[in-house]
């Protein structure tokens, strides 16, 4: 479980001092949860996110424990370093909006016909309760030939999960190389 500290002062000077000490500034919020301003050690936070298996993960700020999902993050445009993260605290049985990653498997037929695999949509917007949240959408791209794509409507449907993206949006496809 990730452990962080609660920020008592939310001034710019305080945030700069924490960043200088290797902390990542974070906000935890959600339906029925009081907003908490916190900070996590940057390197352990990134390492934990890379190794986690599920979208929802536990964090501890002070004496409070939250089940959270990364809602938004900000990076420094020059150094590409993570500088801020918003964590959505989820509550069992309460519907929320999430962005679920798309993963693909297989080698498309179209690659042998001088095609290039294009991932158009990296995340799918869904609305559901946290206990029904899929960890990812897995797409088999093996049958795709040049100028073919998989649309949102072709994705696997999960029970109690409403996909918010339009049905006709391409998720992944094979385009002709120029």
Curated annotation (Swiss-Prot):
Pfam families: Ribosomal_L25p (PF01386), Ribosomal_TL5_C (PF14693). GO terms for biological process: translation. The keyword Cell membrane does not apply. GO terms for molecular function: 5S rRNA binding; structural constituent of ribosome. Keywords: Ribonucleoprotein, Ribosomal protein, RNA-binding, rRNA-binding. HAMAP family: Ribosomal_bL25_CTC. Part of the 50S ribosomal subunit; part of the 5S rRNA/L5/L18/L25 subcomplex. Contacts the 5S rRNA. Binds to the 5S rRNA independently of L5 and L18. Belongs to the bacterial ribosomal protein bL25 family. CTC subfamily. This is Large ribosomal subunit protein bL25. It comes from Helicobacter pylori (strain Shi470). The gene is rplY.
